[in-house]
């Protein structure tokens, strides 16, 4: 939704190419995350290179953001790998915790509901990541 009472017009994410960044049904993204964490997509050396999040570049790695975040309920910071996509008011977040082989797929079509930043310890994504990765 662009606003609480006005829906976003229909879009075809494929028409946006790389601008869409991430699209697909939730189960497909969950399957992708499981395969990525299990090493079925790329080998250990390339996976390690991809996950080298550079703090000088907002923790950007190769096609992902990779960082440690303070999550509620976890002992110490948790290593996370994140991929995002957005077109208009539609947002997608894929957050992976490789050390425990768990992931979170989040879709939102509400511009009035801020997803926040996990690394900053704020917002809906942080709350859901804390529940998914720490309160198990």
Regions found by a protein language model. Give the residues of each.
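Catalytic loop of the DD-peptidase/beta-lactamase superfamily, centered on the K-T-G motif
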Residues: 3-136
């Amino acid at each position: 939704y662009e606003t609480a009472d006005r829906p976003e017009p229909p879009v075809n994410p494929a028409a946006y190419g790389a601008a869409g960044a991430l699209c697909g049904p939730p189960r497909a993204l969950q399957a992708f995350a499981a395969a990525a964490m299990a090493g079925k997509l790329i080998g250990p050396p390339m996976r390690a290179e991809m996950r080298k999040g550079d703090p000088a570049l907002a923790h950007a790695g190769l096609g992902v953001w990779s960082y440690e975040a303070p999550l509620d309920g976890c002992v110490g910071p948790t290593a996370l790998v994140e991929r995002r996509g957005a077109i208009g008011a539609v947002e997608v977040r894929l957050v992976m915790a490789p050390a425990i082989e768990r992931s979170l797929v989040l879709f939102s079509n509400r511009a009035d509901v801020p997803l926040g930043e996990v690394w900053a310890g704020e917002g809906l994504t942080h709350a859901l990541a804390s529940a998914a990765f720490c309160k198990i």
